[in-house]
Amino acid sequence: MARIAGVDIPREKRIVISLTYVYGIGTTTANKIAEEANVSPETRVKDLTDDELGRIREIVDNYKVEGDLRREQNLNIKRLMEISSYRGIRHRRGLPVRGQKTKNNARTRKGPVKTVANKKK
């Protein structure tokens, strides 16, 4: 297996698909990286030369991926919480941040249902 940005990428798949195993690289970015490295997107990882892998690694090093990207995202969320912006408050309370309604659903963000016992009549 070839290692790019600390991730073992599958050898049998095309380079564009394999690059998407790295956190922070999607299909569009993977295509740009392959084009920049002068590698055909159809090439399988096992068929790449060491020189081509080296070029791809150098290009990927210019992007924020894996741990650096995760760290930056966490710091951004912490900053929002520290300045007590609306988005930061929603993050702190574990509620949807982007304006979704919460009366009925939002179960992914709110967690499992906390059942409240009915008042006996």
Swiss-Prot record:
The family this protein is said to belong to: Belongs to the universal ribosomal protein uS13 family.
GO molecular function: rRNA binding; structural constituent of ribosome; tRNA binding
HAMAP family: Ribosomal_uS13
Claim: tRNA-binding is one of the keywords in the record: yes
GO cellular component, one term: cytosol
GO aspect biological process, one term: translation
Assembly mode: Part of the 30S ribosomal subunit. Forms a loose heterodimer with protein S19. Forms two bridges to the 50S subunit in the 70S ribosome.
Gene that produces this protein: rpsM
NCBIfam families, A to Z: uS13_bact
Protein name: Small ribosomal subunit protein uS13
Domain of life: Bacteria
Primary role: Located at the top of the head of the 30S subunit, it contacts several helices of the 16S rRNA. In the 70S ribosome it contacts the 23S rRNA (bridge B1a) and protein L5 of the 50S subunit (bridge B1b), connecting the 2 subunits; these bridges are implicated in subunit movement. Contacts the tRNAs in the A and P-sites.
Family matches, as InterPro entries: Rbsml_uS13_C, Ribosomal_uS13, Ribosomal_uS13-like_H2TH, Ribosomal_uS13_bac-type, Ribosomal_uS13_CS
Region (Disordered): 91-121
Keywords in alphabetical order: Ribonucleoprotein, Ribosomal protein, RNA-binding, rRNA-binding, tRNA-binding
